[in-house]
Amino acid sequence: YMRQVANSWNRTEPWSQQDQAYRLYVLALAGKPDLAAMNRLKETRLQRPVSQWLLASAYALSNQQEIATKMIRDLSFEVTPYRETGGTFGSTTRDNALILQSMVILNMQQDAYRMLEKISKAMGSGNWYSTQETSFALYAAAQFVQKYLGSQKGIDITVKTNSGNENVKTDKTIWQKQLVLQGDKASVTVTNNGQGSLFVRQINSSAPL
């Protein structure tokens, strides 16, 4: 059915373009890409960045990585704030989640992490989100974790600071260390001894004089 609808599609409205891009993305996810319909959509002037992200994902899933890479070159990560109360019930957060899915498929790990942070901050804000927004956000986050952290079992790192080296091995996935200033400087080097991805965040704080 989806292939039939994809082949008969001939609209140009932004929302319809996004519907078609998502349709082709799902077909590619199912291992049944429709390259003819994908090529037709690619030749259309896509009016929403998320449509381009979805179509690029469809190409990547169809072993057309070169085309996918060209499509996302200089493509915006930003979604204009909006919320639909009908149609696809789209929103900024829902579209960010779709872009995160695309980034994971296209192996854009650093960009995907920043998008995951943005989505996590939004979902943790206490604002109301629809079931669709929540489900897309959780699904995209799960894809990120599965690809980049799925095989990781805890943390195995070496931390070098002003006071020496420290080997840290724990089953936990989060570890914190407070650095002590020596004079007005504190330096740290973290070496990942494990097989999975490691994300390091430095948080600075000070008291006014």
Kindly label every feature range from the protein language model.
Residues 6-209:
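Long, domain-scale non-catalytic interaction/scaffolding regions in large secretory-pathway
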Residues 1-4:
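Acidic/histidine-rich catalytic neighborhood
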